[in-house]
Amino acid sequence: MSKYKIIMTGGGSAGHVTPNLALVPKLKELGYEIQYIGTENGIERKIIESENIKYHIISSGKLRRYFDIKNFSDPFKVLKGVFEAKKIIKREKPNIVFSKGGFVSVPVVIGARLNRIPVISHESDMTPGLANKLAAPFCNKVCVTFPETLKYIKDNKGVLTGTPIREELFKGSKIKGYEICKFKDTTKPVLMIIGGSLGSKVINKSVRDALSNLIKKYNIIHICGKGNLDESLQNVEGYVQFDYVKDELPHLMATADLFISRAGANVIFELLALKKPNLLVPLSAKASRGDQILNAKSFEKSGYSMVIEEESLNSEVITNKIDELFKEKQKYIKNMNSSSANNCVDKIISLIEKYKK
């Protein structure tokens, strides 16, 4: 029988889920039973259930900063989710709740507070997301990745921890990566494209438009997002595409020499930890609250990343930038090697241990 019980939450994108998984091995080692609360159709369900973690479903509406007709109905879904989460938490009696943000987390955090269960949350980006802003008053502590984020967290609740990184990412095998990709010319450097868990149409198009030039110099691993595979490119030598990867990811990342990526905090800190030179294409301000732009600028200023605005992206620019990145890769690796950032799993675990009921 487990000594303690923790309920985790977070969803909407993989970035609100995978940091939770980074904590799981250590929590199990300490004797915690782990359960998860998420939505029925969210990406979190697929990820969590594949880890054999007990999964509870609640209702939740999306939290938006812009006008949408659903803004009139979604608050009622959130309210329903609060009562559902409250009931689950009352029944399961966890010692603590850990939230990684995303719209599903708000009713869970409120449900925990209504049951007088302590809550630790984590904010990866430089400026807190709407869900974490709404949840913060109900949390005991809010872990943050960037020092600049602390000024947004009231009541002295902010704790600088960094972002948790899954241990398995450090155990990838380059040999297994090549076996998965079946590249014939192993002398070429490998370029890997990550457009986020949902994919990026603008990155996908720019890469595919530049493909005839890129594959002359690079083998290419393209994670393009669910529903974004291009069947016409399935047999192109030196180019392999996936809609989504899980167990293969550490091996693919070990194989890659260069990356093109969105600038979500989780993925950029993974690239930093693995010392992988990268070209970041943050989500535009029109399509987001601008958090990825701030993340990217911070990494560019530190010399960890090359950055290009989404609006400037095209096949010619992407080819030139990747060639430039490859020529200067040692400079970026040197800068990343001098970084003081490290895996923060132990820091977050110590807070969980301190505040558990």
Curated annotation (Swiss-Prot):
GO terms for molecular function: UDP-N-acetyl-D-glucosamine:N-acetylmuramoyl-L-alanyl-D-glutamyl-meso-2,6-diaminopimelyl-D-alanyl-D-alanine-diphosphoundecaprenol 4-beta-N-acetylglucosaminlytransferase activity; undecaprenyldiphospho-muramoylpentapeptide beta-N-acetylglucosaminyltransferase activity. This is UDP-N-acetylglucosamine--N-acetylmuramyl-(pentapeptide) pyrophosphoryl-undecaprenol N-acetylglucosamine transferase. The gene is murG. It comes from Clostridium novyi (strain NT). Belongs to the glycosyltransferase 28 family. MurG subfamily. GO terms for biological process: carbohydrate metabolic process; cell division; cell wall organization; lipid glycosylation; peptidoglycan biosynthetic process; regulation of cell shape. Disulfide bonds: none annotated. Pathway: Cell wall biogenesis; peptidoglycan biosynthesis. InterPro entries: GlcNAc_MurG (IPR006009), Glyco_trans_28_C (IPR007235), GlycoTrans_28_N (IPR004276). One of its GO terms (cellular component) is plasma membrane.
